[in-house]
Amino acid sequence: MTDKRAVILLSGGLDSATVVAMAKAEGYSCYTMSFDYGQRHRAELNAAARVARDLGVVEHKVIGLNLDGIGGSALTDSNIDVPEAPSEGIPVTYVPARNTVFLSLALGWAEVLEARDIFIGVNAVDYSGYPDCRPEFVEAFERMANLATKAGVEGQGFRIQAPLQNMSKAQIVQAGMARGVDYSLTVSCYQADDDGRACGKCDSCRLRADGFKAAGVEDPTRYFSKVF
């Protein structure tokens, strides 16, 4: 293998689109992976496909999972309302073990591709408080990846890269703009409609809108309602 390959988790949202652009700017051949996991905001899958095309990735995979069969999250269980105000502690929009599952499948693909880098757009500054977005989780998963794989045991270790980890949402927006990300293609809303329009009320919408405002960048998000 002569090219520098990376597998990148691409949800279709602002953060993951920025990560794809950052990896590409670093010279990686980008292979993106999205998941149809029973999320109520399935419009993000269409957004992920748009972003992958626009940024010219080598290959984009969509993996089907039934995390809605497990439930326990407002994002996968229609009986749990998506909150419209920030809450204390870990919110009900946390999907149990989601990033662990996603990274595990990305790890498998990376091993097949002989890619040594896996990128994820987690952030621990302007975020919702999910435990699987913290630096401790990313570091622990990397250690596990190099214990649990043939490549890792043979000394061809993996790196889990989280370049947005310590960036504010405004800094993320600015980084993406500098690398040509078209944020109008992305969907971040937890309850976006089928056309990709955002609710303007959930925590993800609030963080996104605040990020554009703080960055001094016009918000390209389409809303079906907005309370900010």
From Swiss-Prot:
Signal peptide extent: none
Catalytically driven reaction(s): 7-carboxy-7-deazaguanine + NH4(+) + ATP = 7-cyano-7-deazaguanine + ADP + phosphate + H2O + H(+)
Pathway: Purine metabolism; 7-cyano-7-deazaguanine biosynthesis
Co-factor requirement: Zn(2+)
GO-annotated molecular function: ATP binding; ligase activity, forming carbon-nitrogen bonds; zinc ion binding
InterPro entries: QueC (IPR018317), Rossmann-like_a/b/a_fold (IPR014729)
Enzymatic class: ligase
Cofactor binding notes: Binds 1 zinc ion per subunit.
Matches recorded under Pfam families: QueC
Record CDD domains: QueC-like
GO terms under biological process: queuosine biosynthetic process
Gene3D superfamilies to which the protein is assigned, alphabetical: HUPs
Annotated positions binding ATP: 10-20
EC number: 6.3.4.20
Binding site for Zn(2+): 189, 199, 202, 205
Keywords, ordered alphabetically: ATP-binding, Ligase, Metal-binding, Nucleotide-binding, Queuosine biosynthesis, Zinc
Family to which the UniProt record says this protein belongs: Belongs to the QueC family.
Function description: Catalyzes the ATP-dependent conversion of 7-carboxy-7-deazaguanine (CDG) to 7-cyano-7-deazaguanine (preQ(0)).
Stored NCBIfam families: 7-cyano-7-deazaguanine synthase QueC (TIGR00364)
Name under which the protein is recorded: 7-cyano-7-deazaguanine synthase
